[in-house]
């Protein structure tokens, strides 16, 4: 006979961003708890609102499964003394298992007998295991936590109720001084405390108190309500997925409504209006059928439709205050002079150990000079790049960005266009922040891409130079994201810029404000981001490519893909093994690897030397790999007919030199001795 278990934790209002991850974590930890305790179940469903986390287990076994375990002990010769009595070693072993020597049996393993005991544990009734759910709740982890009253245990928010039901049976458990039972809380204003009748009646019992416990149902309610408003007014409403997820975690009983604002505010840049609505007020944006922004918004209240007109008026009033600010800053910022703002950046600290934002811009400008040539920018693009690099942070001192920091770069583009700068300069100022997340949008223009790389490289090198290097999960200056951005942009544009050579060039630059250091650490840091870009590529292939001598990001990613592509083919293993053997022996070469044909003693070493001399890796990675694999028969013939480590030192070094020259060329693709062929 199966049962159903419900566990609900009632809390103070949770931050919206915590709700969904905590709900998921609760479900995962409950499943692990049941598995650990040998309790089978049919399904686990989780619930969450801003004021509760809950999980329900259906089809739960009414008792633990019985457990039978075999334990191996000491060898028989150690377990028995010369008189055939059990030694202290054997007695201690069985005592540790809660058994006696009478439970011992001997089993033979590879010709030798060992002590074995079998321990049987009869499963307990589920009622005896349920109290352990308190430990599940205590094990939840959160990005922030607090303690309250006299309680030293830290948790995300103060706990108010604990509901634990096994079908209709309630459990009087204790969690942070809160007694468990069947009482739960309804909606803060529309509902009241209520008794949950059974584990299966949970949603309906709360629904009567204006709480929709299932987040999926709550989300669907919001979407359906928005769709009805769309149909009624003939408009298009942008249902942003992230905003929707945030809103559903702010309400327990959602009611969507449409408000409006004066059309005069539409003269302000759309980005300002959208930011005011989405980021600051959690409103959905409304457009006409052609995509034009309308003076309306959609909000979702935490409650029903009663007195909705008052709610709409209140939301409109709050939004207008935001829009007034935006309109004011838009008007006043146009009076500012870009060159004046750039000069004032001398007084804005980039970081106290590094210098000002203006100094950061100057260094970035120097880096763009190097990158422009390597990226093959035209004369016009180079001119636009130089201008963009000279002013690209100015908008940080505008009133608009001071109020709406999400608009940095975006407002820079707007203001530079108004000031008569070229569209390319304006676009680069917006694009230099890209990507803003791991999968974020990349710059579209070459000028913007180069400026983005230069800005990020100076940031990375500057922080490394003063010892502010990410460790573990700690990355307060988002250097991993910046590095990932550099790698992604280089790959997307296919620029053949060798990162090691570029970093060497940057270290050669001497600035009055900063001298770069920590080159090796920077290179390893960048390689780690390339590693991440390789995704699910097998670890050994990643290591082979990363250990190679070609540090062009696009080439490295292409090489890894090519190796994965051919790794299942018949000639992969023997070809890699041939190259790997060459790599291992080449490490023994001394000094400069020069080959003297006069020292050849057989045709096979001559053939390999000639093949290596004429080898020029070219074309796509798949073609280069074919070129290398085509050498496999020549390499094998060389090894079969040649004693590489000959007694004659000159002959030995000559043969090692052949292998050294081979591996030097092959290493531009990958270090093949890092690939596992077993």
Swiss-Prot record:
Enzyme class, first EC level, given as a word: ligase
Organism, as annotated: Streptococcus pneumoniae serotype 2 (strain D39 / NCTC 7466)
Name of the protein this chain belongs to: Glycine--tRNA ligase beta subunit
Keyword tRNA-binding: no
Keyword Ligase: yes
Catalytic reaction list: tRNA(Gly) + glycine + ATP = glycyl-tRNA(Gly) + AMP + diphosphate
Example of a GO MF term: glycine-tRNA ligase activity
GO CC terms of this entry: cytosol
Cell compartments where the protein resides: Cytoplasm
Pfam families: DALR_1, tRNA_synt_2f
Subunit structure: Tetramer of two alpha and two beta subunits.
Family: Belongs to the class-II aminoacyl-tRNA synthetase family.
HAMAP family: Gly_tRNA_synth_beta
Family annotation (NCBIfam families): glyS
Alphabetical keyword list: Aminoacyl-tRNA synthetase, ATP-binding, Cytoplasm, Ligase, Nucleotide-binding, Protein biosynthesis
GO BP, sorted A to Z: arginyl-tRNA aminoacylation; glycyl-tRNA aminoacylation
InterPro entries in the cross-refs: DALR_anticod-bd, Gly-tRNA-synth_bsu, Gly-tRNA-synth_heterodimer
């Amino acid at each position: 006979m199966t049962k159903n278990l419900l566990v609900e934790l009632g809390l103070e209002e949770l931050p919206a961003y915590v709700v969904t991850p905590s709900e998921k974590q609760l479900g995962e930890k409950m499943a692990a708890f049941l598995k650990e305790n040998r309790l089978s179940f049919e399904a686990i469903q989780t619930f969450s609102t801003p004021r509760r986390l809950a999980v329900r287990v259906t089809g739960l076994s009414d008792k633990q499964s019985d457990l039978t375990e075999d334990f191996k002990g000491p060898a028989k010769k150690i377990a028995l003394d010369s008189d055939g009595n059990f030694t202290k070693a054997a007695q201690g072993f069985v005592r540790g298992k809660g058994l006696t020597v009478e439970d011992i049996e001997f089993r033979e393993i590879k010709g030798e007998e060992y002590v074995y005991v079998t321990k049987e544990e009869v499963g307990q009734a589920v009622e005896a295991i349920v109290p352990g759910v308190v430990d599940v709740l205590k094990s939840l982890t959160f990005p922030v936590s607090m303690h309250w009253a006299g309680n030293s245990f830290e948790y995300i928010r103060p706990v108010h109720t604990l509901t634990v039901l096994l079908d209709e049976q309630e459990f009087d458990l204790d969690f942070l001084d809160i007694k468990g039972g069947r009482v739960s809380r309804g909606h803060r204003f529309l509902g009241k405390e209520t008794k949950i009748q059974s584990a299966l009646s949970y949603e309906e019992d709360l629904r009567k108190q204006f709480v929709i416990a299932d987040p999926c149902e709550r989300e669907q309610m919001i979407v359906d309500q928005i769709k009805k408003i769309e149909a009624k007014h003939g408009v298009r409403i942008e249902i942003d997925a992230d905003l929707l997820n945030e809103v559903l975690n702010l309400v327990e009983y959602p009611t969507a409504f449409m408000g409006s604002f004066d059309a005069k505010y539409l003269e302000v840049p759309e980005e300002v209006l959208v930011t005011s609505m989405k980021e600051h007020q959690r409103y959905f944006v409304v457009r006409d059928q052609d995509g034009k922004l309308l003076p309306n918004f959609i909000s979702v209240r935490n409650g029903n439709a009663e007195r909705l007109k008052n709610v709409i008026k209140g939301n409109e009033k709050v939004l207008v205050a935001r829009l007034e600010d935006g309109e004011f800053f838009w008007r006043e910022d146009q009076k500012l002079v870009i060159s004046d703002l750039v000069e004032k950046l001398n007084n804005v600290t980039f970081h106290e150990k590094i210098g000002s934002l203006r100094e950061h811009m100057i260094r970035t400008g120097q880096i763009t000079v190097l990158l422009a040539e390597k990226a093959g920018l035209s004369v016009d693009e180079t001119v636009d790049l130089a201008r963009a690099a000279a002013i690209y942070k100015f908008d940080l001192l505008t009133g608009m960005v001071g109020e709406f920091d999400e608009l940095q770069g975006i407002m820079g583009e707007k203001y530079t266009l108004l000031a008569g700068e070229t569209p390319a300069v304006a676009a680069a100022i917006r694009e230099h922040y890209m990507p803003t997340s791991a999968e974020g949008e990349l710059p579209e223009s070459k000028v913007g891409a180069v400026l983005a790389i230069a800005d990020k490289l100076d940031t990375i090198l500057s922080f490394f130079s003063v010892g502010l290097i990410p460790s573990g999960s700690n990355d307060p200056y988002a250097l991993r994201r910046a590095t990932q951005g550099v790698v992604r942009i280089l790959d997307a544009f296919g620029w053949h810029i060798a990162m090691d050579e570029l970093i060497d060039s940057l270290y050669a630059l001497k600035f009055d404000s900063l001298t770069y250091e920590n080159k090796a650490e920077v290179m390893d840091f960048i390689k780690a981001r390339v590693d991440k870009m390789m995704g699910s590529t097998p670890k050994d292939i990643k290591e082979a490519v990363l250990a190679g001598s070609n540090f062009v990001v696009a080439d490295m990613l292409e090489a890894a893909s090519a190796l994965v592509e051919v790794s299942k083919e018949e000639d992969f293993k023997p070809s890699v093994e041939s190259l790997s053997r060459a790599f291992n022996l080449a490490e023994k070469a001394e000094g400069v690897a020069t080959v003297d044909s006069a020292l050849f003693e057989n045709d096979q070493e001559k053939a390999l030397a000639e093949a290596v001399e004429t080898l020029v890796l070219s074309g796509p990675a798949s073609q280069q790999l074919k070129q290398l694999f085509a050498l496999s028969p020549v390499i094998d013939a060389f090894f079969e007919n040649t004693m590489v480590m000959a007694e004659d030192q000159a002959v030995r070094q000559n043969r090692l030199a052949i292998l050294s020259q081979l591996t030097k060329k092959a290493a531009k693709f990958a270090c093949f001795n890092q690939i596992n062929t077993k």
